[in-house]
């Protein structure tokens, strides 16, 4: 009965192939992401403070 068992492929086989593929996407460093978020937060605070006087 033990001879009828089928073996499964290793679980990491698909992961290695996934990370080896190159995609055509915009690549942003972690520092760039943090900078973009900080700029958006500053813009939001600016609009919150001065938006009513600027836009009526």
Curated annotation (Swiss-Prot):
Alphabetical keyword list: Cell membrane, Membrane, Protein transport, Translocation, Transmembrane, Transmembrane helix, Transport
Extracellular side: 52-56
GO biological process per UniProt: protein transport
Protein localization: Cell membrane
Recorded topology in the membrane: Single-pass membrane protein
Chain segments annotated as transmembrane: 30-51
NCBIfam families linked to this entry: PRK01253.1
Protein name listed in UniProt: Preprotein translocase subunit SecG
Gene name of the encoded protein: secG
GO CC terms, sorted: plasma membrane
């Amino acid at each position: 009965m033990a001879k009828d068992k089928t073996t499964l492929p290793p679980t990491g086989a698909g992961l290695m192939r996934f990370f080896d593929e190159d995609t055509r996407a915009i690549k942003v460093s972690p520092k760039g992401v943090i900078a973009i978020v900080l700029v958006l937060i500053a813009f939001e605070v600016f609009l919150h403070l001065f938006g009513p006087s600027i836009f009526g």
